[in-house]
Amino acid sequence: MEEIKKRIIFLIDKINKTNYEYYTLNESSLNDQQYDALFRELLYLESKYPEYNYKFSPTTKIGGPISSKFHKFLHEKSMLSLNNVFNIKELKLFYDRISKKISNFTLLTELKIDGLAVSLKYKKGILDKAITRGDGYQGELITDNVKTIKELPLKLKEPLDLEVRGEVYMSYESFNYLNQIRKKENKSLFANPRNAASGTLRQLDSKVAAERNLSIFLYTIVNPPKFIITQKSILEFLTYLQFPVNNYYEYVLNWDQLIKKISYYEEIKNHLGYNTDGIVIKINELSFHSIIGYTSKAPKWAIAYKFKVFKTETLINNILFQIGRTGIVTPIAELLPTIVDGSVISKVNLHNFDYIKQKDIRVNDFVLVHKSGSIIPEIIEVIKTKRKNQIPFEMITHCYSCNTKLIKKDSNHFCFNLDCEEKKIQELFYFVSKSAMDINVLGLQTLKILFYKGFINNISDLYSLNQYKKEVEELHGFGKKKFNNIIISLEKSKNKCLSNFLIGLGIKNVGIHLAKILAQKFENIDNLQKASIESLLKIDEIGIKSAQNIKNFFLNSKNLKLIEKFKNLGLNLFYFKSKNNIKNNIFKNKKVIFTGILEKYSRNQAQNIVIELGGVIINSITNKTNYLILGKNPGSKLLKAKKFNIKVLQEHEFEELIK
């Protein structure tokens, strides 16, 4: 059972990290298929082991946290995501579930456009606001950028108050043209049309958005007029109002017709001029939607059928290696650059030598690579019919960085030399990463320069960089401005929470989630350092291996000296919330909900504070709700709170309470 719990926590951390990358940073370390597989595994494990259902699980959420660049706006009606199915068998289960609840229903199929979901508000027929999905409850105001979309009407033919939703995307033609321009200007290329569209919508200068030729398809109306009774009539009414609507929607009467429509979409999907990764299937009759209902994440009356993964053929030019901070040596295949779904792919992670051996991958082999919405591809198979005189790949025996003999452990090869330069650089890079000390001005290449010039050798040296001010400023590509930015960022990072510092130390098995728990439990580095294995094992999330790894880290004299140095350098090694123990029970076991926009906190920050103080975040008001935290522009939750006589806290009252 301990392994099950660890797996669930791993999946939660991995998916939450990916959600943040995807929804907030417009990037992703997982492709769609990998993400979907992890998400489905988590759903399965949570249903089978309900005792390990955590309130911070991504299965209870819609998307990711909100970016801080734009003004926030609360959605009057949540922008839910869709559940996915990946084959006909799963689709049949969806169809049968519907059939058991209602009869005489029809379906409408629409193309699933791979872009960025937006909600548009019109007042008296004039476009007033455009908002991203955000976390599903609150998005970003991107009105000026959306107004640059040429086919979008800024004024309707009728003076209606209307909220419509759709998908902003970039055509392949516009995407390729944009990347050609960026290449000429020596700028980094966008990975795919979706990233280009997302990045464009988040431009602070709408002139940039106007130059990039975005497009949009509208697909629904929030609270449609009473005369509209089907999804098909929604699309027809949107067309009447001269909104751009994707014309590849199909009216479906039964299961047999649905299968035929899927075959039709499979045939046309590669000839559209824009990226689509599936089909959205909805119950056509709007009156049935409330009967079938919703989960907290998605409607039960709609499903997304994902197309089979696209694949392409390319050549392996070479197999190189990279070393991680733990010493693990990973082989990387360098590919003849190829485009899959609009993304340029030039490298593939080959994981380990056993993986290469199992697939019999060789330099100069032709391989099939697949990808679904990410720049990280996977080799499906080697095309052995095209193989000529390629020789089997041999694993290196010594570290390419320090020439230390590699040790094989399970399926992986490791360099255990503590002085390996490449490992040290990766340790530095991990320490400054966003989840750790978040020093984003120190990228990998900058760290390499500082390391090889002898200015830094380990993570504590970063905070003594000021002694080399003159020398660093004289380096090519640095200068006074860059150096000052580095020093300012380093000083700012000294005030990070203990949990960030614990992540940066790179203790084995201590990731984001466990670091936060350790910081909360022990409150400062000294208490954690003194903790026994027995006291560590009393924490639900910690097993025997993790406890031993934590204890061994703090028994190492080298690590203790490092921590002492950090203390002398003035880093915060305390958990922020430990300064006032009285407040630790303020929200204990209390059900808390938010409405409106807070001025001093993002929704995500405020919710995390409540969770840290023992509270439970809920998404809808019931008579068992304890607190409603009220921001500006509140939604209908305020009326419901008054109806149930629930205690309402203004933002300043909330702030006083948590101080």
Swiss-Prot record:
Enzyme Commission numbers on file: 6.5.1.2
Substrates-to-products reaction catalysed: NAD(+) + (deoxyribonucleotide)n-3'-hydroxyl + 5'-phospho-(deoxyribonucleotide)m = (deoxyribonucleotide)n+m + AMP + beta-nicotinamide D-nucleotide
Highest taxon, organism lineage: Bacteria
One GO-annotated biological process of the protein: DNA repair
Gene Ontology terms, MF aspect: DNA binding; DNA ligase (NAD+) activity; metal ion binding
Entry GO CC: cytosol
Active site feature: K112
InterPro entries hit by this protein: BRCT_dom, BRCT_dom_sf, DisA/LigA_HHH, DNA_ligase, DNA_ligase_AS, DNAligase_adenylation, DNAligase_N, Hlx-hairpin-Hlx_DNA-bd_motif
Cofactor field: Mg(2+); Mn(2+)
The UniProt record lists the keyword Manganese: yes
UniProt xrefs under Pfam families: BRCT, DNA_ligase_aden, DNA_ligase_OB, HHH_2
Amino acids binding NAD(+): D32, Q33, Q34, Y35, D36, S81, L82, E110, R133, E167, K282, K306
Keywords from the UniProt entry: DNA damage, DNA repair, DNA replication, Ligase, Magnesium, Manganese, Metal-binding, NAD, Zinc
Principal EC category: ligase
Binding-site positions, Zn(2+): C399, C402, C415, C420
Boundaries of every BRCT domain copy: 582-659
Chain's role: DNA ligase that catalyzes the formation of phosphodiester linkages between 5'-phosphoryl and 3'-hydroxyl groups in double-stranded DNA using NAD as a coenzyme and as the energy source for the reaction. It is essential for DNA replication and repair of damaged DNA.
HAMAP family hit by this protein: DNA_ligase_A
Similarity remark: Belongs to the NAD-dependent DNA ligase family. LigA subfamily.
Descriptive protein name: DNA ligase
Organism: Phytoplasma mali (strain AT)
Gene that this polypeptide is encoded by: ligA
